[in-house]
Amino acid sequence: MQTAQINGTTIAFEDTGGTKPAVILSHGFLMDHSMFDAQVAALRDTHRVVTWDERGFGGTKATGDFSYWDSANDVLGLMDHLGIESAVLGGMSQGGFLSLRAALTAPGRVEALILLDTQSGVEAPETVEPYNQLHAAWVEHGAVAVQDIIAGIILGPV
């Protein structure tokens, strides 16, 4: 993987390169850029495809608190670093959250959105608490300690 300094963070990414129309894919929570390997293989002959690891996942470390707005600025900064003026942004789950925010931040740079299993609204109050518990447990005890909380969020009560 390549890396670039974007907004004070070392962002890990892969880029098929070239001058073809650009597609930038942002992964979901608890995943990394490799979730899009099949899509990269399918698109690489007709598009420049960029996948990246968002803060706190894969090869990109989280260096402090950040928001989806920060992540949106990361993808726009990555576009600047790669000399990509505009692109189709695709995102799954949290990747969709940040892709939507990038489109709101810089609408002239986003040609289209590909949104998978994501939403544009605010989380319902009853779903916020499990995420707060997840965050607190992760910060205090690490990723292994949160597997039951994650299972509950994904699968319902266990």
Place the predicted regions along the sequence by residue.
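Flexible "cap/lid" loop of the alpha/beta hydrolase fold
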Residues: L100-T105, V110-H141
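Helix-loop "lid/cap" segments that line or gate small-molecule binding pockets
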Residues: T118, Q133-A137, D148-V158
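Structural signature of beta-strand start/N-cap positions in the alpha/beta core
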Residues: A22, T46-R48, E85-V88, R109-A112
